[in-house]
Amino acid sequence: MFFAGFGCLIPFLPLWLEKVHGFSGAEIGVVLAIAGFSRAVAGPLTAAWAHGRSDRRAPLFMFTLLLTVGFGVLYVLDSFAAVFAVILVLDIAYWGLLPVVETALLRLTRTAKPTYGVARGLASAAFVIGTTVVGVLNDWSGSFWPIWGFMLVISALMIGGSVWMPREPVLARAEIAQPFGDRLLAGLGMLRNSNFTLFIFAAGLIQASAGFLYTSGSLVWANQQGMSSKEISMLWNIGTLAEVGFLMFLGNWSARFRPETLIVAGGIGAVVRWTALAALPPLWVLIPLQLLHSLSFAATFLGGMRFIQTIHGDDRAPTAQMIYMGLANAPTYAAAVLISGPLYDRLGAPGYLAMTAVAAVGLVLAVLLWLKRDTSPRTGEVPGQSNGRS
């Protein structure tokens, strides 16, 4: 359900803001960017709070309730300030759920079937379903209200899903009894690990380089290339299906490579992808470019998850994920989004070239991390991975 909602939120929220609320590209960029910057504060705070709960479902309850109330209120709002305030909360809540869901998948598939790659691939398939359903409903209804309705229903269903899930207690650990401030400092203390710090900014910049695509990609396809919602949905789905295929069918194969190698591959894919999209390629070229999502996102993502799990283990992985998303991924993504709106308004598709530069910086950092891969001791290896990898 979470990823089906993501399939609506990422490609269609900018269209909702433009078509229903009349926001310009710059205003859309401001709304999404400020929400992203706010995650830099909310991420570590949420991580410290969640790390002190005795039930791993606690963040699910909190975030899904916020989402349902937020989307319900969004229907009656009209002013820029009011919509901005609600989108801020919704963005923090939805992205706050992501590390909780991701680490739960990684943890629960460790000792049970399906494998993580298959489970994450199925989750990405739900993204495709969400994108397809909303795209078809938009065209069928001739409006953009299905975007709001779909997100409200998904958010409400996630509350029910959180209640239905069996309680998963956290094994006794000292952090639960620690004061909130101590847990917060312990989480931030992860940054003392230089490899972890280099990783979060390498992967963060590579993934943040998708900011123009997520903010203005649908607008470019609709307004500059005259595509329908169905065609836009198809392009998004091709990218996501490439992600699904990589995770489900190449996930185990990719385990022969070090996590750092996957991140480098993701950086290369991102540089090629954004450079080509800047040229307004025809549909037959857009299709293979969308397949590069398997590198720019999936390889970077999988490498990042394995890197975090390797150095921090099960108990600390959710906190490490939130620190990564809060202090590196969110601010860099927010900055990319902030410049994407004005770039789209002034340049259109050539604005992708700014994302090429962002991805290139991330690639350089990833190469530096790869070069350091044998210089620092690790706390362990993720099951299913072997030593001596490339």
PLM region spans:
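Helix-loop boundary and gating motifs at the non-cytosolic
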Residues: M1-G36, N195-S233
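Helix-to-loop junctions at the C-terminal end of transmembrane segments
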Residues: V41-D55, N138-D139, F246-P259, Y344-D345
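Structural signature of the two symmetry-related core transmembrane helices
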Residues: A58-G72, L152, T261-A276
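Helix-loop junctions at membrane interfaces in 12-TM secondary transporters
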Residues: Y75-I87, A278-Q290
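Cytoplasmic helix-loop-helix junction between adjacent transmembrane helices
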Residues: L88-L122
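Symmetry-related core transmembrane helices of the 12-TM Major Facilitator Superfamily/SLC fold
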Residues: P146-V163, G351-W370
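A late C-terminal transmembrane helix in Major Facilitator Superfamily
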Residues: P318-L347
